[in-house]
From Swiss-Prot:
Biased composition (Basic residues): 16-25, 268-277
The encoding gene: NST1
GO molecular function: actin filament binding; microfilament motor activity
Location of this chain's protein in the cell: Cytoplasm
Protein name (database record): Stress response protein NST1
Keyword line: Coiled coil, Cytoplasm, Stress response
């Protein structure tokens, strides 16, 4: 312990002095290694060398020396341009006798002219992250004290600073604005402190915005509980502050507890401790520190600002807490600032404080930027040493302190993250200051005073202008002037002492230097050396340490180091880093903190301004903490706090005498006051001591400000010297460079002259060589020109020769071309002659053919006219009989018709549903078959076209001759096969090639319910395509409509007159027949016809259903679907006996069985509107008696056409002679299955030989077998050709032989020789053909047919 001065320390109570003496004694007995070297007393052994001459900028910040921790914090953070740009600093122009040292690793802050000039001037990310790491580790310690009394003890400007710094969002108490209710609020506060520190350290908004993105997501929810809120706001613990130690278990248990839910600290009974004689020794032993435990979880709400205990190591956190920042990779970007929160309403100041404030009580919307010391209090990773006391030149060893119960062991606070000046800088400033003259020193101090006064006046501009405030301003200026005068005297005396010490006559003056009031603070804010006025420690009675019994602080108490001093002895937790330790006691004690109570001192009556800024007797440490902060703010052009300090100094000046008098009257014995511990206060200082302490505080402020001023002057001097040195070096370098250039120029000139001579010689040699070369080139050119002329002459001769040869070749080619053209012309003329003769022959043959055809057509027309007249008369008669019959039958069948109609409608509905379902399947099958048929038809058409072209002329003659020579007897077998007799007059049908049919148009089939019971009639769709032209010469009787009443009911024609079955050929889709088809009515099949006699047309491989009774020879071949398509069937009808057997009825239902299908089409694929043939429908009697509707597979009309069916145009059929089967166009049976020569208006097959009751509609009737026309008027017919109806079964016109007389004469059904199925005469009226249900339909049909016939005629 230093013993420079034996005088009692000023500004300290006896209890504090005793405590310090006791600590010093224990530290001297237990020396420990120093945590950091003490550099303030070091003197440079030798003058450091000057910086290198290569520094180009006279303002290069490299010579601003700010080394690491352990030195005084001279921060270059103020605005030089605004602070020092108005006054010229008088510098000593003479030689600088002192030595100085320059550090080239300077780190500057924003706001300085030198900031940003070099990369080393910015702090690293690692430093900032380390500071933030320590900050977050200290955030959530629940043991930090928080009480209103402590907050109230703070000066108004400190409280206002905290309010402006952190806008809290939690619940705010009346006197504590910094309370928060959640860890998130604490996290935001830490972020703001980091941001402020980053801005103060020169990082700017960009870097401080994202300081800690590397923190994992849980860091927000679980911050590290190692940083105090007070330290976050820029208030550090006093360097001598340590956690209190307990001497007995009773006090340890007494002080334990947690803050209550409402924010109040746990109440602890304030017991008056008595002296314990016997137990003092046992309680003096130090308590062993417990194992590190995780901090107890803080309550949900903490309404007070936690006080900052000694830094403790981070405890073992639970597994869910985030990893410490020190273990995480550093982030490249600073932490983003938290969302702005609404600032709480500040505590309204007292009337006295409000009168001293120049502005309103509301905090400014944008508070002034905090200094680096005030805003960036986040500790860094380096632990600072706390090993020096005021006035001590030695270091105290750091000893381990037993951690109190319920708390984690303490660790040294980390170092500050910005750089500070070192002892070498301080020595350089001292040497520079001593080297200045008296006038220069006075000028520097005057400049400093004027600058401070100017700042203060600028602050006064915004203050009140009343007389009271005016007097206050005058007092402040007077006080400031007097203080600076006193400080100048101190500077002069301190400089004299330093000069004497420099000569070695006496030791150097106490204090950190180089000026009176200077203190040295390391990077973490720990005071390492104090000012020269700092009081020394002396031994005192240990009983007076704490105002309690002497046993409380025994000699065996374990004080770790300087930080063991109680916070309440020397200041608050939020004391700034530059606080001195030799300060008076704080305000009245806080009974519920975790610190021991202060010794009871009777507080004297406070003056009116007793709680002001300079209440040195009770709150000096806090004020001195603010002194360095005020100085830093002044350096940053913020003089608000300085103005407050000066206002309070002026107030203190006015009440000083009164206070001195009051203090003298209230002095009592100090020992008695210490024993009276009810109030727990220290003895206040006297007014003189307070004045001295105030002067000391101002010296600290002025020294910090003046250090910057002198440092600026020193830097300017160094910069000027460096600039001069640099200019000299540059000049020398220029001279050297100029000399070298002159030397180089001379040498270059010599080289140029030598090279010039060499070039001239080389040029002469080159000219000689060029002259020789030029002559040689001229000779070569002459030779070349002569050779060129010779070559041109030879080329001309060759060109003339080639042209002559070419002309000869061209003449020969022209002659050959003319000869070839002549031959081609002759050949063309011969071909044209031959073609002309051929055309003449063809035209002649065509005219003859047309003449014959016209003759046949004329004959046929006449026959049709005769037939039409007869048919008309017959229809009238039949219509009359029909009406009479219908009237008789209508009444009898009306009841039956209704019942049958209802049943039939149900059956028809079910059948149509089934038809629709099977229609889709049939369409698919037909599409496949249609593709096959189209391919076969294409091949067939090609073969037919070739055969027709070659035999066109021959076929015409053969057809004429064949039609003339056919005997009548030859037609008998055919008629016998059909159950007919040949007509009395044999007709001579002539086979003519039918006109090619156009593609049919799909017609929609519209079903019409017929009145016939048990039968649902449907409208027959009309197909619009031409039919084959009848042979020339064959009489056409279709003009005479065949009335339905001309025959017996069993022999009715299958097609009504006027139906498409009787239609003549149509030209371009229009009907030219006298009886166009009726589009709404169809006839049922005659009862006497076999319903099962169904055949497929030519080209479709359907197996025909053979009729009852065996028809040999031609019938088999004609009905066999296995016969090749287009191959004529040459077998003729063998005899008429077999036809007779058909008529006789001696046949069996199963004699005529279907043969296997042809390979072209499957058996189940038929033309549109035709039912499929199956064996199940060929049984005779059962089918005849069946009254059920037709099977659902009979798709009617165009409904059978699929969307992908191709409309095939049948080709012209190949003519045949005699009984040969003509070649049918493939698919013609599909579209022209009508039994009439004129074709049907719809693709409806021929009527079946059905039994009574099974009367399918026209659309359901099957077609004839291949090669046979089973029309009602089946006259003489060549197999495979459609012929007009010349009478026949059931007609009124006579056929061949006696068949026409028998059948044509008797319509009543008594002579039934024309029936195919059943008995002769088995038809008749008994079959119900003309039943009443047909009457209305037949009447309308007959009327329409008659009208059409009349219109066409």
């Amino acid at each position: 312990m230093s013993s420079k001065s034996q005088q009692p320390p000023t500004g300290l109570s006896k209890s504090a002095a005793k405590k310090r003496a006791k600590k010093a004694a224990k530290q001297s007995q237990n020396p420990q290694p120093q945590s950091a070297p003490q550099t303030s007393s070091q003197t440079p052994a030798s003058v450091p060398p000057l910086p290198p001459a290569s520094v180009p900028d006279p303002l290069d910040p490299a010579f601003f020396n700010f080394p690491g921790p352990g030195s005084y914090p001279i921060d270059v953070q103020y605005d030089d341009t605004a602070y020092y740009d108005q006054v010229d600093v008088p510098l000593n122009q003479g030689d600088f006798p002192g030595s100085y040292s320059i550090d080239y690793n300077l780190s500057l802050q924003n706001g300085s002219q030198l900031a940003g000039l070099s990369a080393p001037f910015n702090i690293t990310h690692d430093d900032l992250i380390s500071a933030a790491n320590e900050l977050y580790k200290r955030m959530a310690d629940p043991e930090f004290g928080s009480d209103d009394a402590y907050w109230s003890s703070l000066p108004p400007h400190i409280r206002q600073f905290i309010r402006d710094a952190v806008p809290f969002t939690g619940s705010i108490s009346q006197s504590t604005p910094g309370t928060t209710s959640s860890q998130r609020t604490m996290y935001q506060m830490a972020q703001q402190i980091v941001q402020a520190a980053s801005q103060g350290m020169g990082l700017g908004h960009g870097m401080s915005a994202n300081l800690m993105p590397g923190i994992n997501a849980n860091a927000r929810s679980f911050p590290s509980p190692q940083q105090t809120i007070g330290e976050e706001f820029g208030f550090h613990r006093h360097p001598d502050t340590r956690e209190e130690e307990y001497d007995d278990e009773e006090e340890i248990e007494e002080d334990q507890g947690h803050p209550a839910a409402n924010g109040d600290a746990p109440k602890k009974k304030n017991k008056k401790k008595k002296k314990k004689g016997a137990n003092a020794a046992s309680l003096s032993a130090p308590v062993e520190p417990p194992a590190p435990l995780p901090p107890l979880p803080p309550p949900s709400t903490l309404s007070k600002i936690p006080r900052a205990p000694a830094p403790v190591p981070q405890p073992q956190l639970p597994t869910h807490q985030p990893q410490p920042l020190s273990q995480q990779p550093p982030s490249l970007n600073p932490l983003p600032p938290p969302a702005p929160a609404s600032a709480p309403t500040p505590t309204p100041p007292s009337s006295r404080a409000a009168g001293k404030q120049p502005m309103g009580t509301n905090p400014p919307a944008n508070p002034p930027a905090r200094s680096a010391r005030a805003a960036g209090k986040a500790p860094a990773s380096a632990a600072p040493p706390h090993n020096a006391h005021a006035g001590h030149s030695h270091n105290h060893p750091s000893t381990a302190k037993p951690a109190p119960k319920g708390k984690s062991p303490a660790t040294a606070p980390p170092a500050k993250i910005w750089t500070q000046s070192s002892a070498e800088d301080r020595e350089n400033i001292r040497v520079f200051w001593l080297g200045l003259s008296e006038a220069e020193r006075r000028d520097l101090l005057r400049i400093e005073k004027d600058a401070v006064l100017k700042k203060m006046k600028e602050q006064h501009r915004h203050s009140c202008g009343c007389a009271v405030c005016g007097r206050k301003k005058v007092n402040i200026e007077m006080e400031l002037d007097q203080l600076y005068e006193q400080y100048y005297d101190e500077l002069r005396s301190y400089a004299a002492e330093q000069r004497v010490a420099a000569n070695g006559l006496r030791p150097p003056p106490s204090g950190a230097g180089p000026f009176p009031g200077s203190v040295e603070v390391d990077a973490s804010g720990t005071v390492t050396q104090y000012d020269h006025r700092a009081p020394e420690l002396h031994d005192h009675d240990p009983d007076d340490l704490d105002g309690e019994e002497s046993e409380e602080y025994d000699d065996d108490d374990d004080y770790a180091d300087d930080d063991e001093l109680d916070d309440d002895d020397i200041g608050t937790d939020e004391a700034d880093v530059g606080d001195e330790i030799d300060e008076p006691p704080p305000p009245p004690p806080i009974t519920h903190r975790q610190q021991p109570r202060r010794p009871p001192v009777k507080a004297p009556p406070r003056s009116e301004g007793g709680d002001d800024f300079l209440s040195f007797g009770s709150n000096l440490a806090t004020i001195k903490g603010g002194i360095l902060t005020i100085a830093d703010d002044m350096l940053k052009n913020d003089g608000t706090k300085f103005l407050e300090m000066m206002e309070q100094l002026a107030i203190r000046r006015s009440v000083r005498e009164e206070q001195n008098l009051r203090d003298m009257q209230e002095e009592t014995d100090e020992e008695e006051e210490e024993e009276d511990d009810d109030e727990s206060r220290d003895e206040p200082m006297t007014e003189k001591e307070r004045a001295e302490e105030g002067k000391r505080m101002f010296q600290i402020f002025a020294a910090r400000m003046f250090e910057q001023r002198v440092l600026q002057a020193y830097r300017e001097r160094v910069a000027k010297q460096r600039e001069e040195q640099l200019l000299r070096e540059l000049e020398e370098e220029e001279d050297s460079k100029r000399a070298k250039e002159e030397k180089k120029a001379k040498e270059a000139q010599k080289k140029k002259d030598k090279k010039k001579a060499q070039k001239q010689k080389a040029e002469e040699e080159r000219l000689a060589r060029e002259a020789a070369l030029e002559e040689e080139k001229r000779q070569a050119k002459l030779r070349k020109e002569e050779a060129e002329r010779e070559r041109m002459r030879r080329q001309d001769e060759e060109r003339v020769r080639r042209e002559a040869v070419k002309r000869a070749a061209q003449e020969e080619a022209q002659r050959q071309a003319l000869e070839r053209k002549r031959r081609q012309q002759e050949e063309k003329e011969r071909e044209e002659e031959a073609a002309k003769k051929k055309r003449e022959r063809e035209e002649k043959a065509k005219k003859e053919r047309e003449a014959r055809e016209n003759e046949l057509k004329e004959k046929e027309r006449k026959e049709r006219e005769i037939k039409a007249a007869k048919e008309k008369a017959e229809k009238e008669r039949i219509a009359k009989e029909t009406l009479e019959k219908a009237e008789r039958d209508r009444l009898a069948k009306e009841a039956k018709e209704k019942a049958e109609k209802i049943r039939q409608e149900r059956l028809e509905a079910s059948r149509m549903e089934k038809v629709r379902k099977e229609e889709a399947a049939r369409k698919e099958r037909e599409a496949v078959e249609q593709a096959k048929i189209i391919a076969a038809q294409q091949a067939q058409r090609e073969r037919a076209a070739k055969a027709e072209k070659n035999t066109a002329d021959k076929a015409a003659a053969e057809r004429i001759s064949a039609a003339r020579v056919i005997p009548v007897a030859a037609t008998a077998p055919v008629l016998a096969t059909l159950g007919l007799k040949s007509p009395s007059k044999g007709s001579t049908p002539q086979s003519a090639p039918p006109v090619p049919q156009l593609s049919p148009v799909k017609g929609a089939a519209r079903p019409i319910t017929n009145a016939t019971p048990g039968r649902s009639m449907q409208k027959t769709p009309t197909a619009y395509y031409p039919q084959p032209v009848p042979p020339v010469g064959v009489a056409s009787f279709s003009r005479m409509p065949l009335a339905q009443s001309f025959g017996p009911p069993g022999l009715r024609p299958a097609y009504p007159t006027g139906s498409p079955a009787y239609s003549p050929p149509r030209a371009n889709g229009s009907s030219i027949s006298p009886n166009p088809p009726s589009r709404g009515f169809t006839d049922p099949s005659p009862p006497g016809f076999d319903h099962n006699l169904r055949t497929a047309p030519i080209g479709v491989g359907f197996p025909p259903v053979k009729p009852s009774g065996r028809i040999p020879s031609m019938a088999d071949d004609a009905f066999s679907p296995t016969a090749p398509i287009g191959v004529p069937v040459t077998r003729s009808v063998s005899s008429a006996g077999e036809m007779g057997s058909l008529i006789s009825g001696s046949v069996t239902p199963d004699d005529y069985r279907p043969t296997p299908p042809a390979p072209i089409a499957p058996p189940n694929l038929g033309p549109i509107g035709r039912p499929s043939f199956s064996d199940g429908q060929t049984s005779g009697p059962n089918v005849l008696r069946s009254t059920s509707p037709p099977p659902p597979d009979r798709v009617l009309g165009s409904a059978a056409l699929g969307a992908d069916d191709e409309i095939v145009q049948p080709q012209q059929r190949r003519p045949t002679t005699s009984w040969d089967m003509p070649t049918a166009a493939p698919g013609s049976g599909r579209w022209s299955a009508s039994p009439s020569i004129w074709g049907s208006g719809d693709p409806t097959p021929a009527p079946s030989w059905g039994a009574p009751g099974s009367m399918p509609t026209v659309a359901e009737r099957p077609g004839p077998p291949p090669g046979l026309s089973l029309s009602p008027g089946a006259g003489v017919n060549v197999l495979g050709q459609r012929q007009p109806s010349f009478g026949g079964i059931g007609s009124s016109f006579g056929g061949v032989g006696a068949v026409g007389s028998v059948i044509g004469g008797g319509m009543g059904g008594t002579a039934g020789s024309g029936l195919v199925q059943g008995h002769v005469g088995g038809g008749g009226y008994s079959q119900g053909l003309f039943s009443p249900q047909h009457q209305q339909q037949q009447q309308l049909q007959l009327q329409l047919q008659l009208q059409q016939q009349q219109q066409q005629q």
